[in-house]
Amino acid sequence: MATENTPVRIGVLTSGGDAQGMNAAVRAVVRTALRLGAQPYAVMEGWAGAVAGGEGIRPLNWDSVGSILHRGGTIIGTARSKEFRTREGMLSAAANLLEHGIDRLVVIGGDGSLTGTNEFRKAWPSLLAELVETGRITPEVAAAHAQLMIAGLVGSIDNDLVGTDMTIGADSALHRIMEAIDSLSSTAASHQRTFVIEVMGRHCGYLALMSAVAGGCDYVFVPELPPADGWEEDMCNKLQAGRAAGRRDSLVIVAEGAQDREGNRITASDVCDVLEERLGEDARVTILGHVQRGGRPSAYDRWMSTLLGYAAAQEVLRATPESEPHIIGVRHNRIAHLPLMESVENTRAVASYVKAGDYEAAVEARGASFAQMLQIFENMSTPPVQGSHNEASPVKNKRVAILHAGGLAPGMNTAARAAVRLGIDHGLTMLGIEGGFPGLLDGAVKELSWADVEGWVGEGGAALGTHRDYPTIEQLYSIGRALESNHIDGLIVIGGFNAYLGAHTLIKERDRYPAFNIPIVCVPASIDNNLPGSELSIGADTAVNSTVSTLDAIKLSASASKRCFVAEVMGRRCGYLTLMSGLAAGAEKVYLPEHDANLNEIASATSDMVNSFRDGRRLYLVLRNEAACGLYSTKLLADIFAQESNGLYDVRESVIGHVQQGGNPTAFDRLMATRLVTNAMQVLVDELVAGTARGHYVGLVNGEFRDSPLAHMNDELDLVNRRPRDQWWLRLEHVIPVVSQDEVAIDKSKLPPL
């Protein structure tokens, strides 16, 4: 039993279905609790461990959760416990928790697990009274632990909890689905075949809808918006139109909870039968099943779950008996504290909306981005032969060109595809400029049709090409002539810092060159994530995932011996890639250009490293941004660490390099590209309709689309360092020493909440 002299004891458990990223959350809860002076315990196998007691409840130390970030599932096990739902089961769980002095819990699970936890919390006083009455605990123990304090984290690949943007595991599940769709699309195209793919999600259509958009699919069934009567004919017509427009394959996504408006299930087999009967299609069914729960967690499900676990440990340790229970969720990449039962009730209301036929309310409950993606999917997947409604468009036949500039970013092809198809949907004639601004100078301009961008949605690289050069003063006249000779009425520039500088130059020189008086819209695409007006850029998520995959391999290579690895990460003078990769890979130390380290700080870090190896550490991972630490290069840092090791450990360096720009874009980057271009295209069309010619740059800030004037771009920028003045992610830097460096002292009183 706990006494006044023992530390506060908290339990952590995972319950219900497993989800990738649970281990990252468990690790963060345990290590944050230890850093705050508490003693964490693992409740093994979900609530079954609490009911069973004994080895089902185990104390954890720092090393108990080492080297688990990259692992799928949950190392402490999970289960759905029938016994816990009974009064006797709850009595056993309470008695076993109190045997270890635990009256604070962090529970990671779905809405059912969180509801059961809240019922347990509400029953706690009566459970204690009964335990005292039966002599299983003393009155003193009951008085010392009069209330149960809880914090919930949503672990669910379905992403079905209303109020949080993402749940633990949803992004990783999307990774698995996209891997399957990308693989199936190549074999489907080879045979001109149709695939019907069933994805998980229960009664939530998030996975189905987002994978349909990110995978460039033809048709999708989601539970929130059952298809109207006659859906069979509508689907067949759309697939036929896609083939007529140049598609070699057809992909249909079916959510496992899909149904018609009478409440009858629509299965993948039902859809397959319709296609074979009505179109004579050689349709194949692929049910992805539990592969969506498996595999390594994505980078997002590592770094965001780490932040959630960090915040949950703080929340439950701050809680008082009067505190209302909260779910720690995510809104706009920020930690959000949501009333537990209100969130659960709002989630369960979605099913009642669907049952009542109020589909608008069901879609609205899923959030604004869900409704927007439904419309985007309809526009993007509908070939122009079905888009005759645009014959009367006020911008019909206006010529809009797409241009990439700056460094390559995965997702550029996705963005270009979206621009072409959405532009055609608006009635525009879409042009592609090959090779960036130099390509415009050379006249490398061609018209792009709906079919020309088929297959671009998941392709890495840039089919139109990109170039870092942007117009010099001497080239402006030729740029103007190129715009005029190609009759370009508007320009969408997709790229990085140099893309923005080039567009800004055209805006500034309008008085001298009338040809520049066209609407210009910049869309952020850079692995550096250093662009104004947007918290995230296209390509950054893919780059973080590529970096983390490489770091996972590096860590495995170092696990056989005591070793420090110093890895150099790209990003120029912006540390986003370094910090997020450090959080996701479990780096012990990161060096960012925003906070250049001096010799004293490097000496202190070296001393901490030596002490940690003396205490038994086997691996120490240091990440250095390519522009951080001034003259202290990656090699020099490695040499310093090696010199001070005195044979205790060895040191290796690794420059990760351009692998960070490569690979196919992640689902996140595909969706980001599609959303940003949708809004950019609307801004440009509004300019054309109004007859104005302003310059804009678009982005997402606090989850909302933002459109800013290009003429004032420099107000947001630190031009010397080529990055925004305010960078939201820097507020996360303090989390790394809390969850990765037990040898470094921290001031608990100054540990900021997220």
Model segments located where?
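N-terminal phosphate-binding or glycine-rich loops at protein starts, especially the Walker A/P-loop
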Residues: 2-54, 394-441
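Glycine-rich oxoanion-binding loops at beta->alpha junctions
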Residues: 2-3, 50-103, 114, 140-142, ...
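Short glycine-rich or small-residue beta-strand-to-loop segments that form or flank ligand, phosphate
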Residues: 9-17, 74-79, 103-109, 152, ...
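Short, ordered loop/turn segments at secondary-structure junctions
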Residues: 15-18, 43-49, 80-81, 110-112, ...
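Short glycine/serine/threonine-rich phosphate/pyrophosphate-binding segments
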Residues: 19-29, 50-51, 85-91, 111-118, ...
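Accessory alpha-helical/coil subdomains and C-terminal extensions
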Residues: 40, 107-109, 115-149, 167-285, ...
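C-terminal non-catalytic interaction/assembly regions of soluble proteins
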Residues: 267-394, 636-754
